[in-house]
């Protein structure tokens, strides 16, 4: 079946998202097996999974970049984005969800709703993505489907509607009860679960199945008046009517269908595929995308293949065989190989060359794609993640994909000067692929600084420098991205005057500095009556920014302050933009003593799951790291400890936690906020920075 011949109603753009180790990559592998894309099965723990195609992913058994793949099921075209579950890679999840119409949230049947599950769920909420839940690993000891369903309510505030019940638990898990058909589905044999059969519901589950069927029908009735009248009126309701009502409720965000299975044991995946086709939205079921035209007016963009082309570049990556690949979601119109399109963010033209449908690390050439589809474009020169591509003559801009600020940095330098240029090119390529990776230069040492979302994130980047680009680097210890801020308001009237032979320099500025909680930095000019000519005012802001970027206390960037230019004076001959830049810069430095400068540190939200007997040890250790415990709850024989800890005290924590709990505890961590560092610790940090 050719890609472009598929009707819009038959397209499903879905993401598979979950906590690390919940089994989403294995689930995707089974989907590819049953839809005929894979002939053999790749296992994550063997390092052979198709979707995990980067070397680092194969070694670590985690999914790092969203690999896109296309498959077909029952006449529907399914574009799948396999998203990472590690918190260091939330930018991958964020940008994937931005371009998807629906999602499958995979949960570990033993662990239930884990911290990263909450993070990706919040991201899906933010983008209004309808979703299904798949409770995986039902074959594992301790798996509890019903507890998982309860956690969807208590942890995620979801409204689950249960469509299946498990038959058997842990090793005796053999199938599911389908509450829509009211039949049991059994998998057996050594054919990787390809064959299954419908039977009568087992007698010992009949009563429970009837109870949950009633709950299902009542949940649907709450969201559909016609259905309610029929159901409570005792009329017969067909399977098709039930499915249509579940679809409407899912797409309308009224509830979340819940299914179960064991991807690793090849059970429950085909009904999950059926549910993707039956219940998740097509591009025509979602809200229109909003764009802006050149006048700044909002425009509704409909998924019409005959309208002018509009697409969003949601991912740029380097393919070892094809080179640069840009993944684009087509929101409107048709894109053909050979077309010339406009990148509305840089106003550059791009010629469309090879167009590819991707299957993890293999590819299929196509000549044309229409609205609703996801396609990879080879060789675009000037397009980055978040850019809008559109037809020339109809320039529109879509909202960009926002990357979080980095919280950790490392210094890198090439092992030989001959590799300096090679490293710079490699780093530039990696930054184009990954908006959450930032690069800067240490002006004092000349070293390149890589800034990212966590230790694992930067480890992977260093690994890729070596493997993909053959760049060997020396690496410094990880450093926390501290900030400075002001805590007191102060007004300064400062004059910069310099007279040497010939023209001199003159600029006077009167400025008010004050704390500002609503953002990083705000500059405002209240100059009236020509006290300072308009063309000199950008010089004032430039001088302030130069100090802001370098810091005053310990050379960390300054955030959270506002400067108002109140008044000033100029000289007809001696004033210039440069003179006002110097005046503002020196005034800022002069005011420093009065601004109550403080050091800010990144705080991390931490969640630790530990066996009960190590609870005291774990809490004591967190307290010693200046952590604050927010809550603690029981989860079976384990304890879940949530708290907030400074990032500076969390380096190498995974090894300390393993040794103190004999490897039985696990943790996750994500950035929470910047907060003022205690004065005595800040003083030590400042002394150390000044000494160096």
UniProtKB/Swiss-Prot annotation:
Q: Where does GTP bind?
A: 18-25, 82-86, 136-139
Q: Which cysteines are joined by disulfide bonds?
A: none
* Gene Ontology MF annotations: GTP binding; GTPase activity; translation elongation factor activity
Q: Where in the cell is it found?
A: Cytoplasm
Its domain of life reads Bacteria
State the InterPro entries in the record: EF-G-like_DII (IPR053905), EFG_II (IPR041095), EFG_III (IPR009022), EFG_III/V (IPR035647), EFG_IV (IPR047872), EFG_V (IPR035649), EFG_V-like (IPR000640), G_TR_CS (IPR031157)
Q: Which Pfam families match?
A: EF-G_D2, EFG_C, EFG_III, EFG_IV, GTP_EFTU
What keywords would UniProt list here?
Cytoplasm, Elongation factor, GTP-binding, Nucleotide-binding, Protein biosynthesis
Give the HAMAP family listed for this entry.
EF_G_EF_2_B
Q: What does this protein do?
A: Catalyzes the GTP-dependent ribosomal translocation step during translation elongation. During this step, the ribosome changes from the pre-translocational (PRE) to the post-translocational (POST) state as the newly formed A-site-bound peptidyl-tRNA and P-site-bound deacylated tRNA move to the P and E sites, respectively. Catalyzes the coordinated movement of the two tRNA molecules, the mRNA and conformational changes in the ribosome.
Q: What is this protein called?
A: Elongation factor G
Species this protein is from: Neorickettsia sennetsu (strain ATCC VR-367 / Miyayama) (Ehrlichia sennetsu)
